[in-house]
Structure formats: structure tokens, C-alpha cells
Amino acid sequence: MLRIAVPNKGSLSGPAGEMLHEAGYQQRRESKELRIVDPVNEVEFFYLRPRDIAIYVSSGKLDIGITGRDLLVDSGAHAEEILPLGFARSTFRFAGKPGAATGIDDLKGRTVATSYEGIVAAHLADRGVDASVVHLDGAVETAIELGVAEVIADVVETGTSLRNAGLEVFGEPIMKSEAVVIRRSDAEPDETTEPKVQQFLRRLQGVLVARTYVMMDYDCRVEQLEKAVALTPGLESPTVSPLHNEGWVAVRAMVPAKEAQRIMDDLYEIGARAILTTAIHACRL
């Protein structure tokens, strides 16, 4: 049975559970559940602190896990990213009082507070900057006001917390993070679990594609078909079927959801009609 770690709380937990549900896996009904078994898919899910997941996976006790890229890197665990999932996106940055610093070189000899000591220490060392790093478990925005540090390094999603604390970001981003699937770096493919791992990844990839694309159907005249197909090439090639009325064809193709409205406008302009889009709930490419 495949053993998978899932975040039990925080910004990773809800979207991870939703994606797994869309991928056809049973999920917990109550937040207090720490372990459930999905007998149909032969998967056992363990709900763990997001910060601990990389450690469990690197130990080999669990086959794969879902966590944040920032948490994976900060842990220093012997685990690697195998699939980005596109949610819980954030940027890790330095911040301070306005005018306190403009770049990383200004941090020499100063104190930086962060909940991600591993990421910050490695980033500073890679750039030859000698600064003190103070580890705090949370609410690092108050570290400057209380005199614990002169600068902080933290995850920035909207920047609201920083602005409320009178802080502003500076310098280049330290890293960009999102939810990722991880596995042990030196994991040897096992004939029992590896097919399940690959099936799991295919399912999640199918969810990602289904969220990104819509199915578009429309009718157009044969003489406008090439122009229409140029607008809707599909992933491989669109499906084209003759209609009962001579000189007309029906076309079906997957198109990027973000571009659907523009494509519909362009199709209408060249004479296509009965244009509609349908949500894709699951797919395999």
C-alpha cells in the first residue's frame, strides 16, 4: 500500500485535500483524523505538520508527500521535488523598515530574523554575506519593533502583514515557493509501490490540466476551417466532424481556460457559431 504524507493544517492543507479528492482519492472527513486508508486505491494517507513532511519522506517511512518547496529546502532533508502543484504560491523575501536596506549586501554584520533559518543561512552564505540569523517560530514581523533583529526574511503572499507592520520588501526574491510532491532523493524504484506512485502523479497531473483547460465546441463553414483550427489547435489536433448541412463542420478542441473568451470572440469574427465551452473534470494526456 502506498503511504503518502499530506499537510494537516495551514494554507497547504485545504487545497491539497481538494486536489486529492478531485484525483479520486478518499480524504478525511474530520480535521482531527491523522490517518486514513483508501482501500479502493490502496493508499494510506498520513496528515502531518507541513514542516515535518520532508523529514518523514526522507526517512523512507513514507513513500511520497505534499509540502511547500520552501519547507522542503529549509528542512535540509534528503528529499526532492518531483511535481509542482500550482497552489499555495508565495515568494520568500527580505523586509525591513523603509530605507533600512536596498539589497543583500546591506545585510553584512546585521541580524536577520526568520522562521526559515536553513533557507536564509544558505542564501547568505552563497553570496558571501556574513550576517547573524535568529530563528523565530512565527510572527517575525514584530522582531524589528522589539529589537530582536534589524531585518526579517519571510514568506510574502499579499504583503498585507508587512505593510501593517510598517515594513517593506527589498532586494531580489530569495526563492519562489508553491506546493510540491516530494520523494526521497535516493529512493529505489520498488515493483510494488512504483506503479502506484506513477499512477498518483498521473492523476494529479490530470487534475492540473483539467483546471487549466476547457473543452471548446463550435460549428464553422468549411472555407473558414483552417483559420478556425489555427485558433484552436488543441493539444494534438482538433476533432473535426461533418454536419448534416453541407459545407459546415463541427470542431472540438481543448483550449487554455484563461484564453477561452478571447478565442470565442475571434472564432465568432470569422463566422463560427454555436460556440460553447465545457469544464474538464479529469483527463489523462
Curated annotation (Swiss-Prot):
Major localization listed first in the record, in broad terms: cytoplasm
Intracellular or extracellular location(s): Cytoplasm
Transmembrane feature ranges: none
Keywords, comma-separated and alphabetical: Amino-acid biosynthesis, ATP-binding, Cytoplasm, Glycosyltransferase, Histidine biosynthesis, Magnesium, Metal-binding, Nucleotide-binding, Transferase
Classification via Gene3D superfamilies: 3.30.70.120, Periplasmic binding protein-like II
CDD domains, alphabetized: PBP2_HisGL1
Required co-factors: Mg(2+)
Gene Ontology BP, a term: L-histidine biosynthetic process
Disulfide pairings: none
Domain of life assignment: Bacteria
Pathway entry: Amino-acid biosynthesis; L-histidine biosynthesis; L-histidine from 5-phospho-alpha-D-ribose 1-diphosphate: step 1/9
EC number(s) stated in the UniProt entry for this protein: 2.4.2.17
InterPro entries, per database record: ATP-PRT_HisG_long (IPR020621), ATP_PRibTrfase_cat (IPR013820), ATP_PRibTrfase_HisG (IPR001348), HisG_C (IPR013115), N-reg_PII-like_a/b (IPR011322), N-reg_PII/ATP_PRibTrfase_C (IPR015867)
Reaction equations catalysed: 1-(5-phospho-beta-D-ribosyl)-ATP + diphosphate = 5-phospho-alpha-D-ribose 1-diphosphate + ATP
GO molecular function, one term: ATP phosphoribosyltransferase activity
Enzyme class: transferase
Activity regulation annotation text: Feedback inhibited by histidine.
GO cellular component, one term: cytoplasm
Pfam families in UniProt: HisG (PF01634), HisG_C (PF08029)
Similarity remark: Belongs to the ATP phosphoribosyltransferase family. Long subfamily.
Function: Catalyzes the condensation of ATP and 5-phosphoribose 1-diphosphate to form N'-(5'-phosphoribosyl)-ATP (PR-ATP). Has a crucial role in the pathway because the rate of histidine biosynthesis seems to be controlled primarily by regulation of HisG enzymatic activity.
Protein name: ATP phosphoribosyltransferase
